[in-house]
């Protein structure tokens, strides 16, 4: 029903946005003989020895954990803090993901004008504003939260469009394209899964320790839920924005392969 239609619409919007994405130039890397290759275990660890990749990965991890926390706690926040119904929660999800997909062409235009890093920074700051607003919501303010879902979904578009492009650019300029790009992608995918694991594995026990249990109506417990759902991601997003600005934008020696 509603959810299937929303997923189909989101996939269609994402496909249309992908069609507008710029294609990176293809460069055929020379194939080395077996005698010229490093051992496989060294190839696996090679990305972590590269300062540009470590810097980008640090920003990606901090930002990813900040984004994963609301995703892990959204159902509890909507049900217990906002007193939202199941259809309203379904609508929140529809608005969030459709907004994220539809915002990607706009973010691509921002990238063309201001660059990848500054576009990502703008997305982070938009997300901080959304989370700060969400922290102040009270029970019954579902319309305001729907607006937040649209805006935070738009911020999600930057997370979908920019980090992967930065990684692809880094791989290309480091000379690993076609030779060792699998190692870079492997560490990147591991970081993605680590973001989700840390968000759920840390925040749920923390909420229980703070006195919140699903279905709780205690005002203090619900206030603490709002803090963890919204203010903790704000702090992490601001830290990620600082790292992005410090390591990738204003560094005296911009890491080759990251800054276009």
Task: Indicate where each model-derived feature is located.
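Residue-level signature of mid-helix packing/kink "hotspots" within the transmembrane helices
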Residues: 97-105, 197
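Transmembrane alpha-helical segments of major facilitator superfamily
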Residues: 6, 91-100, 192, 232, ...
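C-terminal ends and interior cores of transmembrane alpha-helices
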Residues: 125-140
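Hydrophobic core of transmembrane alpha-helices in multi-pass small-molecule transporters
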Residues: 61, 143-160, 166
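Juxtamembrane helix-start elements in MFS-like secondary transporters
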Residues: 84-93, 145, 222-225
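Intracellular loop-helix junctions on the cytosolic face of multi-pass helical membrane proteins
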Residues: 1-75, 79-80, 84, 223-260
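Loop-to-transmembrane helix entry/capping segments in MFS-fold secondary transporters
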Residues: 86-87, 174-191
């Amino acid at each position: 029903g509603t959810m299937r239609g929303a997923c189909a619409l989101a996939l269609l919007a994402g496909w249309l946005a992908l069609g507008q994405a710029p294609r990176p130039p293809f460069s055929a890397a020379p194939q080395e003989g077996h005698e010229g290759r490093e051992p496989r275990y060294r190839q696996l660890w090679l990305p972590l020895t590269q300062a540009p990749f470590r810097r980008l990965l640090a920003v990606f991890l901090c930002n990813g954990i900040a984004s994963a926390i609301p995703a892990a706690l959204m159902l509890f926040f909507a049900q217990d803090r906002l007193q939202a119904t199941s259809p309203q929660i379904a609508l929140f999800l529809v608005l969030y993901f459709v907004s994220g997909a539809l915002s990607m062409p706009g973010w691509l235009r921002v990238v063309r004008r201001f660059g990848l890093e500054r576009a990502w920074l703008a997305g982070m700051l938009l997300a901080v504003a959304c989370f700060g607003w969400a922290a102040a919501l009270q029970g019954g303010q579902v319309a305001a939260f729907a607006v937040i879902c649209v805006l935070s979904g738009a911020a999600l578009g930057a997370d979908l469009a920019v980090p992967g492009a930065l990684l692809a650019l880094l791989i290309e300029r480091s000379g690993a394209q076609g030779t060792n790009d699998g190692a870079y992608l492997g560490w990147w995918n591991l970081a993605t899964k680590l973001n989700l694991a840390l968000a759920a594995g840390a925040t749920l026990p923390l909420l229980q320790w703070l006195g919140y249990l699903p279905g709780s109506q205690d005002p203090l417990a619900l206030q603490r839920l709002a803090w963890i759902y919204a203010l903790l991601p704000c702090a992490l997003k601001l830290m990620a924005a600082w790292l992005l600005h410090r390591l990738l934008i204003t560094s005296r020696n911009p890491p080759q392969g990251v800054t276009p």
